[in-house]
Amino acid sequence: MDAASRIYKIPESVLVVIYTPSHQVLLIRRVDAGTWQSVTGSKDHPHEDWAETAVREVLEETGIDALHPQCQLQDWQLENTYDIYPAWRWRYAPEVSRNTERVFGLLVPEGTPVTLSPREHTDWQWLHWQQAADSCFSPSNAEAILMLPRFAPGGA
């Protein structure tokens, strides 16, 4: 496949911090790097809005339906712009070196079942929010989790 016909990733993604009323945060382990993270993923097309991307990625990666009446998806109105790791830059158009990431929180009931996408993730765990922040590979992911007390209903 030549560069002209190749479909590149869109450098706009979401980060979704999934948490319970007791402020346990879901982390999932990546297949390719073995690192722990929250749900992340890029827009499928340029006109997909941030919330659509968040709902789709959560369902694809965890099997959790963010639109379920017992779940509460919240756009935290935060964006991170960062350099794309060199190991992943091949996924993007040659002139692209930075990604913009929109941060969401998703409140789910205690005991929400998790069904991973085995091609993307190998394991999952619920951790206290501070421990989850310490366990993340990505600095922007850790920073988002540390903001949970600011955005979670009732604080943390």
Regions found by a protein language model. Name each.
Residues 1-17, 93-94:
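Acidic, metal-coordinating catalytic segment for phosphate/diphosphate chemistry
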Residues 11, 38, 97-101:
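Short connector loops at helix/strand junctions that flank enzyme active sites
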Residues 20-66:
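Conserved Nudix-box catalytic region and its N-terminal flanking loop in Nudix hydrolases
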Residues 65-78:
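A short coil-to-beta-strand element that immediately follows conserved catalytic motifs
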Residues 77-113:
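Active-site-adjacent beta-strand/loop module that shapes the phosphate/pyrophosphate-binding cleft
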Residues 102-108, 113-146:
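NUDIX/MutT-family hydrolases
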Residues 150-156:
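Generic C-terminal helix-cap and adjacent flexible tail
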